[in-house]
């Protein structure tokens, strides 16, 4: 048994790697045709008429039906020797360590059986996929970390001011709503802030002030608009009343005093020249009425005798 394993190992690591091993199986009950039968697979029960024998260097030994452990080892060795293409390549195992172990002490068939199981194609594929997936996971983690750093660095933190700092800034803003670089630097040193923070605070404060002023102007304009709307409605009502009164007066005026085409006195208009002539005539009439009346000469009445004689 040991000779068979050593022979297989020597041929495998000697460069041939033909998958050939030194083994001897004799059939006691069978003939030459039985010897040409393929070796049994792992886990398959051997025929009851056949007995497997191995060479241990000193002579032949036969495995009885009770020696199940030896028969299992022999079948495992045959499987490993004659079917090397079913084994997978274990990329996680260094060949130097395997060579050292082989030269120091030849492994048994049970160890040889466990190693191919450990390095099966499934395990090889899983190990390869794990190795390929590890860099991608590491890359994803690094990208997430860089994104977090970028987002953290790009996001601005809100400035938290104390009551004293806010009061000083408000007083300064009431005096000057804008600051030159020297005033900005001095105020930043006084408040233990950065000049950029002071500048941003003043910008926000000016924006809030402008917004409040805009709201106030909007309210004022809204009130003015409402007032003008009410005044316009009142004027419309008065105009309607005057038109109704005019129509009523024109309907009640006597038509025999005025011609059909003569408008009523309330709507009579005169040109400037006629107006001057009318005013001059009125003035002359007033002056003549104010002058003293002339005395009218009268004759004395005749005596009564003359009147009687004539009669």
Swiss-Prot record:
Location of this chain's protein in the cell: Nucleus
GO cellular component: nucleus
Transferase keyword on record: no
Molecular function as annotated in GO: DNA-binding transcription factor activity, RNA polymerase II-specific; sequence-specific DNA binding
InterPro entries tied to this protein: HD (IPR001356), HD-ZIP_Homeobox_LZ_Class_II (IPR050762), HD-ZIP_N (IPR006712), Homeobox_CS (IPR017970), Homeodomain-like_sf (IPR009057), Leu_zip_homeo (IPR003106)
Gene3D superfamilies: Homeodomain-like (1.10.10.60)
Pfam families cross-referenced by the UniProt entry: HALZ (PF02183), HD-ZIP_N (PF04618), Homeodomain (PF00046)
Biased composition (Pro residues): 294-303
Main location: nucleus
Disulfide bonds: none
Keyword DNA-binding: yes
Low complexity bias: start-end ranges: 119-145
Region (Disordered) residue spans: 29-69, 97-160, 279-311
Keyword annotations: DNA-binding, Homeobox, Nucleus, Repressor, Transcription, Transcription regulation
Feature: DNA-binding region: 154-213
Polar residues bias spans: 280-289
Induction: By auxin and sucrose in primary root apical region. By wounding in leaves.
Region of interest: Leucine-zipper: 212-256
Tissue expr: Expressed in root provascular and vascular cylinder, provascular and vascular strands of leaves, provascular and vascular strands of the whole panicle, in mature embryo provascular bundles of scutellum and embryonic axis and provascular and vascular strands of young immature spikelet organs. Expressed in differentiating and differentiated xylem and phloem elements, and in outer and inner bundle sheath cells of all vascular bundles. Expressed in auricles, ligules, culm, guard cells brac hairs and pollen.
PROSITE patterns: HOMEOBOX_1, HOMEOBOX_2
Assembly information from the UniProt record: Homodimer. May form a heterodimer with HOX2, HOX3 or HOX7.
Protein function: Probable transcription repressor involved leaf development. Binds to the DNA sequence 5'-CAAT[GC]ATTG-3'. May act as a regulatory switch to specify provascular cell fate.
Family label: Belongs to the HD-ZIP homeobox family. Class II subfamily.
Official protein name in the record: Homeobox-leucine zipper protein HOX1
Organism, scientific name: Oryza sativa subsp. japonica
Gene assigned in the entry: HOX1
